[in-house]
């Protein structure tokens, strides 16, 4: 008797939807609380709290609708055999274009073109509502409809340019990989990730935002002095025009080896009260570098990728698995898609584990900045970022433990105060 793989996958998807909806309902209850957490009383104004509460509730209601539609669509696609039907139709198109339907690479690219078109059509109403209703209502959206369409066109163009050679390479590797397939797949994706990490900030990100050098002045001098004191190989210091699309703020760093760069959102510079608060945020980011968090995270991702490819090689020739999902043939891409569905339970556990590690890293980076003497500036900087981004002030502990990669503000402030007392 054949194992009902597809029915099991759909069943687990529904179970996870119910579980995550339960967590969402708990978070909704927390968001409806009319008062600030005790730690934030007197720190955040009632006006900002009310705005944050309204924004968080709007996003929460939107999330309920989006997730309900998503689980309906995903379950229907699997349960009613739409995936194999779509694969068959994408192959039938090729002869009309004078192309060989037996060529798996061409068939796969035709399939992906259809999937991408379908995804854009189904995602568009949600993206438009999120950007031009919710984000606009709460003063974040700065995009025009033309900018939105232009970004979508640019994203599609990049997919068309970068997607085919990557897909072709993966199919070729799977077809020729033999017993060392997992190693070859991992090596290819490892090299690809390094290439993308190199070209994204230089070639891709500038297509969507303008990056300009931070002007000479006290702020630049303080950041360079901090970087130098930590022996951080800072080569370039940029300001990105995030305000052209949103008033959300952030800062990040990137680069390999001796070629590191720091990027500040112009909104971060505008929102912080003084330069020392901005430097405190950078001290936190440099803490991630000094404590090797980026390296550890990258290694963890590579290990997980290798394990996934190893698992894929064990099931890629399983006729029963493909037939359970409605396929008589065993295309490479379809095998990868099916495998991703069958390991959904493990993916949820891994995601939860990575969030735990990420939150621990955030506490460590905060403590690093405090030890450098930035406690009095980091604290108000985090509060300001929370206020200006209208992030949720009240959070359910189970919800945040499961979903959040960063600790809630209340926990971070409490930890900063505790670390600051140790250094006194």
Curated annotation (Swiss-Prot):
Organ and tissue specificity: Expressed in leaves, stems and flowers.
Family: Belongs to the peptidase M48A family.
Binding site for Zn(2+): 284, 288, 362
Region forming the signal peptide: none
Transmembrane stretches, start-end: 3-23, 67-87, 109-129, 155-175, 185-205, 295-315, 332-352
Catalytic activity field: Hydrolyzes the peptide bond -P2-(S-farnesyl or geranylgeranyl)C-P1'-P2'-P3'-COOH where P1' and P2' are amino acids with aliphatic side chains and P3' is any C-terminal residue
Organism classification: Eukaryota, Viridiplantae, Streptophyta, Embryophyta, Tracheophyta
Mode of membrane association: Multi-pass membrane protein
GO terms assigned for molecular function: endopeptidase activity; metal ion binding; metalloendopeptidase activity
EC number of the protein: 3.4.24.84
Active site: 285, 366
Pfam families: Peptidase_M48 (PF01435), Peptidase_M48_N (PF16491)
The protein's required cofactors: Zn(2+)
Role noted for this protein: Proteolytically removes the C-terminal three residues of farnesylated proteins. The substrate specificity is only partially overlapping with that of FACE2.
Entry keywords, A to Z: Endoplasmic reticulum, Hydrolase, Membrane, Metal-binding, Metalloprotease, Protease, Transmembrane, Transmembrane helix, Zinc
GO biological process: CAAX-box protein maturation; CAAX-box protein processing; proteolysis
Effect of residue 284 to A: Loss of activity
Localization: Endoplasmic reticulum membrane
Keyword Cell inner membrane (UniProt): no
Cofactor note: Binds 1 zinc ion per subunit.
A GO cellular-component term linked to this record: endoplasmic reticulum membrane
Entry protein name: CAAX prenyl protease 1 homolog
């Amino acid at each position: 008797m054949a194992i009902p793989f597809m029915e099991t996958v759909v069943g687990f998807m529904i179970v996870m939807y119910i579980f995550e909806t339960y967590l969402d309902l708990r978070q909704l209850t927390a968001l409806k609380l009319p008062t600030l957490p005790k730690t934030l009383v007197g720190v955040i104004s009632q006006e900002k709290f009310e705005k944050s509460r309204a924004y968080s509730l709007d996003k929460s209601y939107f999330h309920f609708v989006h997730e309900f539609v998503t689980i309906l669509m995903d379950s229907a696609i699997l349960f009613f055999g739409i995936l194999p039907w779509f694969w068959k139709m994408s192959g039938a198109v090729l002869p009309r274009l004078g192309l060989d339907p037996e060529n798996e690479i061409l068939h796969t690219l035709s399939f992906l073109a259809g999937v991408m078109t379908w995804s854009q059509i189904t995602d568009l109403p949600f993206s438009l509502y999120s950007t031009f209703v919710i984000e606009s209502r709460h003063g974040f959206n700065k995009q025009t409809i033309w900018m939105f369409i232009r970004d979508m066109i640019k994203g599609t163009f990049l997919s068309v340019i970068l997607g085919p050679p990557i897909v072709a390479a993966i199919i070729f590797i799977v077809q020729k990989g033999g017993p060392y397939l997992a190693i070859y797949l991992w090596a290819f994706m490892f090299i690809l990730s390094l290439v993308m990490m190199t070209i994204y900030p230089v070639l891709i990100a500038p297509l969507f935002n303008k990056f300009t050098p931070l002007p000479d002045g006290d702020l630049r001098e303080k950041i360079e002095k901090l970087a130098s004191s930590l022996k951080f190989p800072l080569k370039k210091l940029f300001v990105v025009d995030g305000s052209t699309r949103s008033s959300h703020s952030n800062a990040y760093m990137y680069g390999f080896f001796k070629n590191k760069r720091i990027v500040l959102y112009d909104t971060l510079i505008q929102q912080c009260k003084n330069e020392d608060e901005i430097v405190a945020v950078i001290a936190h980011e440099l803490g991630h570098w000094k404590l090797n968090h980026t390296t550890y995270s990258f290694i963890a991702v590579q290990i997980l990728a290798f394990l996934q490819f190893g698992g894929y090689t064990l099931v890629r020739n399983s006729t029963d698995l493909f037939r359970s999902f409605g396929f008589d043939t065993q295309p490479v891409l379809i095998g990868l898609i099916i495998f991703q569905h069958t390991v959904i339970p493990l993916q949820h556990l891994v995601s939860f584990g990575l969030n735990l590690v990420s939150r621990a890293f955030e506490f460590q980076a905060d403590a690093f900045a405090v030890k450098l003497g930035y406690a009095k500036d980091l604290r108000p900087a985090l509060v300001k970022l929370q206020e200006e981004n209208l992030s949720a002030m009240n959070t359910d502990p189970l919800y945040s433990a499961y979903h959040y990669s960063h600790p809630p503000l209340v926990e971070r402030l409490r930890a900063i105060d505790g670390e600051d007392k140790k250094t006194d």
